[in-house]
Amino acid sequence: MVVKGNTSTGTITDFNGTFTLSAPADAILSISYIGFKSQEIAVKGHKDIKIVLQEDSETLDEVVVVGYGVQKKSVVTASIAKVSADDLASTAPVRMDNALKGLASGVTVTSSSGQPGAAAQIRVRGVGTIRTENGAADPLYIVDGMPLEGGLDYLNPNDIASIEVLKDAASGAVYGARAANGVILVTTKTGKIGKTKVTYDFSYGWQSAWKKRDVLNASEYALMINEGAINAGIAPKFSDPYSYGQGTNWQDEVFNNNAPMMNHQVSVSGASEKVNYLFSLGFYTQDGIVGGNFDRSNYERLTLRSNTQYTLFDESKERNWLNSLKVTSNLSYARIKSTNFDDNSTWGTPLGSALALSPILNVYDETEEAIKAQFDKYGTTAEYTPVYDPRNGKLFSIPGEFGEMSNPIAKLSLPGDKHWSHKFVANFSAELQLWDNLKFKTSYGADLSFWGYDSYRPLYYLRSGESSTQSSAYSRKEDGTVWQLENVLT
């Protein structure tokens, strides 16, 4: 239960259905529960509200994917959570893994990074004891019948028709030990009977930090340093603390306000009695609110998909055993480019430095002599190679007295690693309906992945212990191939 228009204000009922919620007198409550129809109730100033939900019998007739087949929800005894395309459209997720947040019971989705395109961790009913080759407790991902490795970042959420999460031991009867941590079945969209449908969706938005920490300004900082010195029995460092004024708020300098994000989606689909087809193209870009303006936190994804199905022949009175033959091909390609920086280190990250660095220090130094003096005082054997802002040519300052931290803006201005990946997934199948209750399906799938990164490190000096005395370039490329041949008789 949430307040409509303010999803951060909500609650859940106890075992008896009782709830307590603080809401405005004119608020509208949005109530939902699995197996019942969602309702919206106006508070109208009432303190006590009695709500009776109506059963949603239509959900029991929904078809869900279970292993090698499909069943109606009303006859399924296993624990399955289903997320439809309409559910996904309401949240507009960037990645498939983030699409499950709050939409599937028993599924925990957590993000350890806020950088654009960052992967989320999915756990189905906690952490299992059987791990994957890399030690993770990830569920088994199957897209259109093809088991996939390396995550689902290549999937365009707009191409997804439904997601089924198999959560109990029943999935182990089909997939074995691979299903120990749950199974996530993804079915992509197909065409619908009727005229050819062409759709184009475009969205453009901006991102900014929603909250900043309260920190000391320069005068307050100088007063506190002086107070600490007096308490330690030494002379105060700053003779006139109030002369420093507001100083530098490093959070304002680090955050990239109004970071853009853009999404293009094009699809062509349709179907007849013999042919079903869907072709789609997606292009998504996002700049990070930290480093996006320096090309240090950016994400770009291009996706192509072709789903086709041909009915070569269907049921005929001339045959009493060979009812139908359908041939299906699902082809997809994804190209992803991204840049990022280390965001899980206390002091080495831009945000960590922005919260701890002195507000007395300026972002830039007026003269190179001041920088050289800092280097001579705190520098080591590293060569003197100051860093200039590529946007305006100004010279970045060196926080010499803060040996464990560097100027975060100077650090962001340096070139970062440029990651890239190409992924091709193809799945071909032929389904033969031998008799009314006997079906044979053969399928072949292949997953080809190519990934790597390119980096360049110029000469620079940020602080003692963080410098580069020689230029270097590095390039790394890897690839992997997974294929599957499957024959199923049901």
Protein language model annotation of sequence segments:
Residues M1-V327, V425:
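Short, small/polar-rich motifs associated with maturation and membrane association
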Residues S74, I193-G247, G291-Y299, T303, ...:
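Surface-exposed loop/interface segments of Gram-negative outer-membrane beta-barrel transport/assembly proteins
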Residues L438:
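An active-site-proximal structural segment forming one wall of the substrate-binding cleft
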